[in-house]
Regions:
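Interfacial helix-loop-helix junctions of multi-pass membrane proteins
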Residues: 41-50, 147-168
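Individual transmembrane alpha-helix segments
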Residues: 74-114
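Long, glycine/tryptophan/cysteine-rich extracytoplasmic
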Residues: 51-82
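N-terminal signal-anchor transmembrane alpha helix
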Residues: 20-59
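Membrane-interfacial loop-to-transmembrane alpha-helix junctions, especially the N-terminal start
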Residues: 22, 129-142
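Hydrophobic cores of alpha-helical transmembrane segments in multi-pass inner/ER membrane proteins
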Residues: 110-116, 172-181
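Short, Lys/Arg-rich, polar N-terminal cytosolic tail immediately upstream
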Residues: 1-17
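Short aromatic-rich membrane-water interface segments that cap or initiate transmembrane helices
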Residues: 59-62, 93-105, 161-174
């Protein structure tokens, strides 16, 4: 009987490792997509279109004309509008807003795609021994990446309408560290 029990336990462990491997591989793909979205956001000049940071309440885009006008007015008060996009209309603003919004939304989805399965794996005791702390630290690093992103954007909301290249390098470098882990 102990041999059967050991075999069943080994099969359960093997299955758990498959779940974890599949989850981590999926996360690597999602992080790679995030880096591409970030690059498109940068190349389209969209990164400074959202001048406020609302990590919890900013999940939904403006849903009516009044809200669109509110966020556009905030953008028009920014140095980027005055220096690079003076005269841009609301339709043009919506175009650049999309990429920054999508970048932030994808970040939130990454947090859920990592955090919820991690919680399930922890509760069902399917996390390999010694990895619970590592995975939790990785989740925290992902959240911190959002803070780094805002820190980077904030650097471009000053007199010079351009983000700090050093902060941009930290943001991209952190993304690559997350991908590699």
């Amino acid at each position: 009987m102990p041999a059967v029990s050991a075999r069943l336990s080994a099969n359960a462990t093997s299955q758990s490792q498959k779940y974890v491997a599949f989850w981590l591989f999926g996360m690597a793909i999602l992080v790679a997509i995030m880096v591409v979205i970030g690059g498109v956001t940068r190349l389209t000049g969209s990164g400074l279109s959202m001048v406020e940071w609302r990590p919890l309440m900013g999940t939904l885009p403006p849903l009516n004309a009044a809200e669109w006008q509110r966020v556009f007015d905030l953008y028009r008060a920014s140095p980027e509008y005055d220096q690079l996009n003076y005269g841009m209309d609301l339709a043009g603003f919506k175009g650049i807003f999309f990429w920054e919004y999508f970048h932030r939304l994808w970040g939130r989805l990454l947090g859920l795609a990592f955090g919820l399965p991690l919680l399930v794996l922890l509760l069902t005791r399917r996390v390999p021994p010694g990895y619970a702390g590592r995975f939790t630290a990785l989740l925290c690093l992902g959240g911190f990446q959002g803070v780094i992103g805002w820190w980077m954007v904030k650097s471009g909301l000053t007199e010079v309408a351009s983000v700090s290249q050093y902060r941009l390098a930290v943001h991209l470098g952190t993304a690559l560290v997350i991908f590699s882990l």
